[in-house]
Amino acid sequence: NVKKIFRQFETPPDPELIKGFLGSEMCYVISHGDNDGNLLETAAALDELYLNNMAYMLISSNGETAYLEAENEYSRHRAYFLKG
């Protein structure tokens, strides 16, 4: 199941919303940044990733849900929740 969400990309993502969807305080980070593959606190990961302004994915610690934020070829941001 994939759910596309609308988000104002000029402001940081809401960590409480994303933690609520992921169902965990901790998440795995998939990105081009220094924390790629690491298990981090969700709020801290979001702060760092927002500042880097790159595409990324956060995967719940149990691997069942994910949050993806990406940019397409026209530099339009898109955000998705994914549930396995």
Positions of PLM-derived features:
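Structured alpha/beta or helical-core interaction and ligand-binding surfaces enriched in interleaved
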Residues: 1-75, 80-84
